[in-house]
Amino acid sequence: MPKKKTGQRKKAEKQKLRLKEIRSREVPLADLPCNAPMECDKCEKKQKSRAFCYFCQSIQRLPICAQCGKIKCMLKTGDCVVKHPGVYTTGLGMVGAICDFCEAWVCHGRKCLQNHACTCPLQNATCLECERGVWEHGGRIFKCSFCNGFLCEDDQFEHQASCQVLESENYKCQSCNKLGQYSCLRCKTCYCEDHVRRKGFKYDKNKPIPCPKCNYDTSVTKDLSMSTRSHKFGRQQQGGNSDDEEGYGGYYGAGGSGYYGGAASGGYSYGGDDDEDESDGDYDDESDEDDDDDEEEDETTESEPEKETDKKATK
């Protein structure tokens, strides 16, 4: 029979598990020291933590380590590459290198110098929208909450507003015509219950099913506000009625300003208003003359049968 665990031993085991979870937990990208906010001491502009100011190229008075996040090295005896026994160091006396990926200072601790370059979270931090890296803009880096892609500070809201849009025009599975119950927010595709699972692959019950294409965790489609991509072909009228109601002039000028900025109500207007009025007056005069000619012709046609009847009566 195994011995019963005492209360003190149970507490120690729980504390071990808790510390293990804390060490292995995933820290959000916005809370990492290499992506911390920084305000320049000289130009007072807010930006991402970096070795030199993005705007004025000045050095910070108190640089922050990109790995451990400390400002002051308080280790009297430790793994410091530059030994300083009995003395606390700050500023440039604490730093040891500049990271090529996040452009931030790394302290002179041996552990930070060896580990940060291999585990820097901003190694491939290129914005999905503008395709700029850390060195091309001064803002911080964020991740999309849907597709988990890198975004700069300027495009993060615009991208996340349009991220839940499928590449297809319906919610059907890409391999069959069944309704896609699972959606991959990175590939922007839907999968049914049969095609989301790969053959010969074991899945955990309590974990989301990975995408068969990119291995990113899929989400249930009904839990998301997914929308489909719509394609509009042909000439689309801008805020007016259909072409059948107004003819072919509806797209160019009907209902206010048309495609070319004209204010006509049914077509083009090449000349000025005065020219149009004069041309209208000339057209009215010509139409009156035509009406008089028509009346004279009608009178002559009516008088001819009367003359024939008079001739017959005299005979």
UniProtKB/Swiss-Prot annotation:
Localization per Swiss-Prot or TrEMBL: Nucleus; Nucleus, Nucleolus
Quote the InterPro entries the UniProt record gives.
NOA36 (IPR010531)
- Zinc fingers (C4-type) span which residues? 40-56, 65-102, 127-147, 173-187
GO MF terms, alphabetically ordered? zinc ion binding
Q: Which GO terms describe its biological process?
A: larval lymph gland hemopoiesis
| Biased segments, Acidic residues type | 272-303
Is Metal-binding among the key words of this record? yes
Q: What are the boundaries of the region Disordered?
A: 228-248, 263-315
List the biased-composition ranges (Basic and acidic residues): 304-315
Q: Which UniProt keywords apply?
A: Metal-binding, Nucleus, Repeat, Zinc, Zinc-finger
**From which domain of life does this come?**
Eukaryota
- Cite a GO CC annotation: chromosome, centromeric region
Family, similarity comment = Belongs to the NOA36 family.
Q: Is Magnesium given among the entry's keywords?
A: no
What's the protein name? Zinc finger protein 330 homolog
Primary site of residence: nucleus
* Motif placement: Nuclear localization signal: 3-11
